[in-house]
């Protein structure tokens, strides 16, 4: 009688361990998503830098919050929180392609960080310009990618 319960318990334990253990494919998938995010952020930065609208140059001086320390995937919560205000600032100045790019960035960030929202961002006292903000998140992606290789 107890033997069946013990076998069931062992089977359940093995199933839990197998499903929660990180696999190389999930690591590879995370790397690919980070590379995609990095590329999209670079394209957004390029779109911002190459825009000739004189009003946009004023908007580029607006400051955006950066987390005190962005070193883990959970810190993407901070990027997600700042993307909406960034999109609102840029929406009238950038092409439809850039707006789609912002949407892609949002989707990739959600995929990387998951639906977990319990993490609360601690923002630095100093804010960043839009260009600095994008550059720091591009660097963040590269840093995480390098730890996964």
UniProtKB/Swiss-Prot annotation:
Gene: IL2
Domain of life: Eukaryota
Gene3D superfamilies, per the entry: 1.20.1250.10
Role of this protein: Cytokine produced by activated CD4-positive helper T-cells and to a lesser extend activated CD8-positive T-cells and natural killer (NK) cells that plays pivotal roles in the immune response and tolerance. Binds to a receptor complex composed of either the high-affinity trimeric IL-2R (IL2RA/CD25, IL2RB/CD122 and IL2RG/CD132) or the low-affinity dimeric IL-2R (IL2RB and IL2RG). Interaction with the receptor leads to oligomerization and conformation changes in the IL-2R subunits resulting in downstream signaling starting with phosphorylation of JAK1 and JAK3.
GO biological process: adaptive immune response; interleukin-2-mediated signaling pathway
Entry-listed glycosylation sites: 23, 106
Protein name per its UniProtKB record: Interleukin-2
InterPro entries reported for this sequence: 4_helix_cytokine-like_core (IPR009079), IL-2 (IPR000779), IL-2_CS (IPR030477)
Protein family: Belongs to the IL-2 family.
Assigned GO CC terms: extracellular space
SUPFAM superfamilies linked: 4-helical cytokines
Disulfide-bond pairs as recorded: 78-121
Keyword set, alphabetical order: Adaptive immunity, Cytokine, Disulfide bond, Glycoprotein, Growth factor, Immunity, Secreted, Signal
């Amino acid at each position: 009688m107890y033997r069946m319960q013990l076998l069931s318990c062992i089977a359940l334990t093995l199933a839990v361990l197998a499903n929660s253990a990180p696999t190389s494919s999930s690591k590879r998938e995370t790397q690919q998503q980070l590379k995609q995010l990095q590329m999209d952020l670079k394209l957004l930065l390029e779109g911002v830098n190459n825009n000739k609208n004189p009003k946009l140059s004023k908007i580029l001086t607006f400051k955006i919050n950066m987390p005190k320390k962005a070193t883990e995937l959970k810190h993407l919560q901070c990027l997600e929180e700042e993307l909406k205000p960034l999109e609102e600032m840029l929406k009238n100045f950038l092409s439809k392609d850039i707006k789609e790019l912002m949407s892609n960035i949002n989707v990739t960030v959600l995929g990387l960080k998951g639906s977990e929202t319990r993490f609360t961002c601690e923002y630095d006292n100093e804010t960043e310009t839009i260009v600095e903000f994008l550059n720091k998140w591009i660097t963040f992606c590269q840093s995480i990618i390098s730890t996964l290789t």
